Amino acid sequence: METDLNSQDRKDLDKFIKFFALKTVQVIVQARLGEKICTRSSSSPTGSDWFNLAIKDIPEITHEAKKALAGQLPAVGRSMCVEISLKTSEGDSMELEIWCLEMNEKCDKEIKVSYTVYNRLSLLLKSLLAITRVTPAYRLSRKQGHEYVILYRIYFGEVQLSGLGEGFQTVRVGTVGTPVGTITLSCAYRINLAFMSTRQFERTPPIMGIIIDHFVDRPYPSSSPMHPCNYRTAGEDTGVIYPSVEDSQEVCTTSFSTSPPSQLMVPGKEGGVPLAPNQPVHGTHADQERLATCTPSDGTHCAATPSSSEDTETVSNSSEGRASPHDVLETIFVRKVGAFVNKPINQVTLTSLDIPFAMFAPKNLELEDTDPMVNPPDSPETESPLQGSLHSDGSSGGSSGNTHDDFVMIDFKPAFSKDDILPMDLGTFYREFQNPPQLSSLSIDIGAQSMAEDLDSLPEKNVREFDAFVETLQ
């Protein structure tokens, strides 16, 4: 389309649309991970905080989105779609919603690219953050587990709404006008979710040992199978080497589940085979091979490095405490298994792994239990004067008893209470406080008639004083 944009504005607009598409995929997929996402705001944003939003990217989602884009951008007649589907443990699948980012031919040539388009795209992304959490798929994603998982797929082309069933609804997130067209972000979602209940109760147990899902078709026969991936938090440095688009022969389909964060990823497969560089890295194999990734072409040493400090957690700690530094290295780690995986859980010890920067580590590991800065020595117990006065009667009678068995009795004396009403509980005190007694000064009943009689009798009682006062005035 012929436009009056200069080269710099055209370059900026393409960059804005590209990163908006990537952030759109991140927001949609992260909203289906099944956990709430809390991100702190920063007073000094970095260059990676596009559209004034601190959205931490998950590397695997970014890789799949870039592979789907393949160097092209959403334009007129070229829509980017994110399909969210559900798959049960029995092999049944159901499409839940389809998010579509498209552009039409309606242009706004007077709009400024540098600030106006950028700020409106930021508002559209904020609207997407809110709307992704009000559709029915969000409620299902919060409850996913071993019974079903949520999958996503990114593709370019015509929107495929036939899988949503009858009576699906659509919602428009918003539109942003640009000099080359109007960007539109919309969603079509399923409202008939009776699939889970009907199939769950209609299926009868087999009489013989028949595999129930043997003849169940794949959800997408023309594409590669969807492999459930272990949950990874946003911004986590997984250390996975993602292959390029040319190296991967799979269509842009992947999946994820909301298993708890993996406690340790076992390096290699069952036999410890390192990951080949030309294999696509995602799914359960990526979880098993996340640590040991090496390239035979370069001569670097292949060391097993953990993906993040938050992903590793000690599973077996003896009840007797840590005995020696050798026991720390012998600590057993267990791999977290994803849904539908029947492989045995292998155990690996850190003694078989190479420790990075081992030459800089001290030879004798000093445990935290023996560190005086972490665990200071216990100070001698000093008996306070108040405690001594409270226990003076009991300690004098039986000094041989255990001091920890004594109980300190403190009298409850609420404010503004009288000693004669004790003992009393808190409820009684509250009722007494709500209905206080009347002041004694208000209880004296002085009538108006008696006051008038007293005033009339004053001159008669003090006649001499009044006469003396009148004489002084003359």
UniProtKB/Swiss-Prot annotation:
Q: What is this protein called?
A: Autophagy-related protein 13
One annotated GO biological process: mitophagy
Q: Which InterPro entries match?
A: ATG13, Atg13_N, HORMA_dom_sf
Which superkingdom does the taxonomy of this entry point to? Eukaryota
Specify where the region named Important for interaction with ATG101 lies, as residue ranges. 127-134
Q: Where is this motif: LIR?
A: 407-410
Which positions carry N-acetylmethionine?
A: M1
The record, for Pfam families, names: ATG13
Q: Where is the composition biased (Polar residues)?
A: 305-321
Regarding how it is modified after translation, the entry says: Phosphorylated by ULK1, ULK2 and mTOR. Phosphorylation status depends on nutrient-rich conditions; dephosphorylated during starvation or following treatment with rapamycin. ULK1-mediated phosphorylation of ATG13 at Ser-318 is required for efficient clearance of depolarized mitochondria.
Gene responsible for this protein: ATG13
Positions bearing Phosphoserine: S318, S319, S324
Print the domain comment field. The LIR motif (LC3-interacting region) is required for the interaction with the ATG8 family proteins GABARAP, GABARAPL, GABARAPL2, and MAP1LC3A.
- Organism, per UniProt? Pan troglodytes
Q: How does it assemble?
A: Part of a complex consisting of ATG13, ULK1 and RB1CC1. Interacts with ATG101. Interacts with ULK1 (via C-terminus). Interacts with ULK2 (via C-terminus). Interacts (via the LIR motif) with GABARAP, GABARAPL, GABARAPL2. Interacts (via the LIR motif) with MAP1LC3A, MAP1LC3B and MAP1LC3C. Interacts with TAB2 and TAB3. Interacts with C9orf72.
* A single Gene Ontology CC term: Atg1/ULK1 kinase complex
Keywords, A to Z, come to: Acetylation, Autophagy, Cytoplasm, Phosphoprotein
The listed locations are:
Cytoplasm, Cytosol; Preautophagosomal structure
**Which region ranges are annotated with the description Disordered?**
295-324, 368-402
What molecular function does GO assign, one term?
protein kinase regulator activity
Provide the family line. Belongs to the ATG13 family. Metazoan subfamily.
Function comment: Autophagy factor required for autophagosome formation and mitophagy. Target of the TOR kinase signaling pathway that regulates autophagy through the control of the phosphorylation status of ATG13 and ULK1, and the regulation of the ATG13-ULK1-RB1CC1 complex. Through its regulation of ULK1 activity, plays a role in the regulation of the kinase activity of mTORC1 and cell proliferation.
